């Protein structure tokens, strides 16, 4: 190993920067160090700004949480959905049969048949529909047709 101030062999000077004489050091080393310092300062300021923003958000969240929950309670969720929420009744009624087919319980046979066809095409078991739902659709059609006079 070379002593301080003595020029090292060419191979070692490329590997170990401490063996280089001060005049042989890279001229842009100070620029790189300044960039590093600037980057660290920018990162530090960014973290500080993020911390202050988070602190502000947490402070303002408590009052906003109450306002949001009150507003959510005022909005009625059933009005957003056009679908019937709930399962099937134990014994099917005319009202439920009408809901399944999408017709009035007092609809005529022609309207019931067209509605049955439309709903069955969408829910047929051969096309990936549920056999249980298909059975309920058929049951609704049978119930409405047997109780309808025209």
Curated annotation (Swiss-Prot):
This is DnaJ homolog subfamily C member 15. It is a single-pass membrane protein. It is linked to Absent or down-regulated in many advanced cases of ovarian adenocarcinoma, due to hypermethylation and allelic loss. Loss of expression correlates with increased resistance to antineoplastic drugs, such as cisplatin. The keyword Hydrolase does not apply. Its main location: mitochondrion. Negative regulator of the mitochondrial respiratory chain. Prevents mitochondrial hyperpolarization state and restricts mitochondrial generation of ATP. Acts as an import component of the TIM23 translocase complex. Stimulates the ATPase activity of HSPA9. The keyword Phosphoprotein applies. It comes from Homo sapiens.
């Amino acid at each position: 190993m070379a002593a301080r101030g003595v020029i090292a062999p060419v191979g070692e000077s490329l590997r170990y920067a401490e063996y280089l004489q001060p005049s042989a050091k890279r001229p842009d080393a100070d620029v790189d160090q300044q960039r590093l310092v600037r980057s660290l300062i920018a990162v530090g300021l960014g973290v500080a700004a993020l911390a202050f923003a988070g602190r502000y958000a947490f402070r303002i969240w408590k009052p906003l949480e109450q306002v949001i929950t009150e507003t959510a309670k005022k909005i009625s969720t059933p009005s957003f959905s056009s679908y019937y929420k709930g399962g099937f009744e134990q014994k099917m009624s005319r009202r439920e049969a009408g809901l399944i087919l999408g017709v009035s319980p007092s609809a005529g046979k022609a309207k019931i048949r067209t509605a049955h066809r439309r709903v069955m095409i969408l829910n047929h078991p051969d096309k990936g529909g549920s056999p249980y739902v298909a059975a309920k659709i058929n049951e609704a059609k049978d119930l409405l047709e047997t109780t309808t006079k025209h």
